[in-house]
C-alpha cells in the first residue's frame, strides 16, 4: 500500500449552499425548509442558524481565491433552490441566477472544475 496520492489525483472541496452562503433574506431569496427549521426555537443547538454562515454570497471571490491558493482543482457546490425560485416554482429570481453565474465565471477564471 502506498502512502502517496497518484500524480493525476484531483484535489477538490465540496460545500452546501445553506451552510456557507448566508445572505438568507437579501436579493429576493425565499425561505428554505432549513431556514424555517433553524428559526424554530429549541430545534437547533443554541438556536443557531445560517443567516450569515461564512457569507459566501458576498465573499465568493475571496473564497475562490483561497481555493486557488491551496491549489484545489475541483469544487462541488450546491445551488439554493429558494435563491433561484423564491416561491418554490414559477418565476425565477434573476439576482439568484446572477450570483451562480458570477461564481462559475470566477471558478472558470482560475480553471477550477465544477463537479
Feature annotation, model-predicted:
Residues 113-115:
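Conserved small/polar residues in nucleotide/adenosyl-binding loops
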Residues 2-93, 97, 101-108:
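N-terminal structural segment of carbohydrate-active enzymes
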Amino acid at each position: 500500500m502506498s502512502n502517496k496520492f497518484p500524480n493525476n489525483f484531483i484535489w477538490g472541496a465540496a460545500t452546501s449552499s445553506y451552510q456557507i452562503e448566508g445572505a438568507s433574506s437579501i436579493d429576493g431569496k425565499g425561505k428554505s425548509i432549513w431556514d424555517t427549521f433553524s428559526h424554530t426555537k429549541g430545534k437547533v443547538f443554541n438556536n443557531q442558524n445560517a443567516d450569515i454562515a461564512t457569507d459566501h454570497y458576498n465573499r465568493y471571490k475571496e473564497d475562490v481565491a483561497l481555493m486557488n491558493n491551496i491549489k484545489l482543482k475541483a469544487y462541488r457546490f450546491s445551488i439554493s433552490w429558494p435563491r433561484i425560485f423564491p416561491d418554490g416554482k414559477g418565476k425565477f429570481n434573476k439576482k439568484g441566477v446572477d450570483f451562480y453565474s458570477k461564481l462559475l465565471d470566477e471558478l472558470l477564471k482560475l480553471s477550477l472544475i465544477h463537479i
